[in-house]
């Protein structure tokens, strides 16, 4: 059963939840919330501002060289410098710490909107729009998303490109053999950006690649094109691996023991964070979901 016709009382419940979720998200910004523990001007933001200043004030080549730890200039991050390159050259609000934080907060609001559109793009014929808004609000409850939104941290850039990637992935799956190369190019581009924004998100392009190669109904030629696009977009990252001698910048690699020590517990930690944002997709994956509203009580019954 699909959620096209919703009870009026349930619509009211949905509206109230949506309103207060969005309101609390906005209030969190004005009160400088730090629910994940990494925010604050003395927290991770000081590294963010240092890295941004590096690409804002130095020659591009010198700044890139600094990520390899070969200079007295310090680059402090486990991610590639793409976040800082884009902001240094494209973000007009980087003259002060406060204006930069505001710009990332606005960017995060767009990320939330993009989450809504990615859900709507996939389920628009099956689910009432208000229910999609309700499901998309889950991202506003994440302490990681909230803290990154309020303190200009790095995490939300990867989340942003995940949602864009899923929009193009859905378009390709819906079109099957009629999918065009432009959509395939954009899918490869944005899902590759996921890795540049956070190496852990390598799972995203791998998922798309394997799905379209094995289960996808696109033509063989387009499958080859997809592989070639991914190969081309991986070249800058291959250069960074050559520059660093590792998959993350030198200073963080040495501090974390990357490729030297395996932290098994981090696998569960990372998967938990990623899975949080996929809850609406997993919830809606079930075809037989029955919604029951009796005596002002809401219950959901899933039939396998």
Please report, for each region that a protein language model flagged, where it lies by residue.
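Short acidic/glycine- and proline-prone juxtamembrane loop motifs at membrane-interface regions
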Residues: 147-157
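Specific aromatic-rich, kink-prone transmembrane helix
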Residues: 117, 157-175, 183-191, 205-208, ...
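Extracytosolic helix-loop segments that constitute the early lumenal/periplasmic catalytic or substrate-binding loops
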Residues: 44-75, 82-85
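Membrane-lumen/periplasm interface segments of specific transmembrane helices
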Residues: 27-28, 195, 206-210, 217, ...
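Transmembrane-helix motifs of polytopic, lipid-linked glycan transferases
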Residues: 89, 98, 102-125, 164
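Short helix- or helix-capping micro-motifs
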Residues: 131-143, 191, 195
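Juxtamembrane segments of multi-pass membrane glycosylation machinery
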Residues: 74, 78, 82-103
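Start-transfer (signal-anchor) and selected internal transmembrane alpha helices
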Residues: 1-31, 296-303
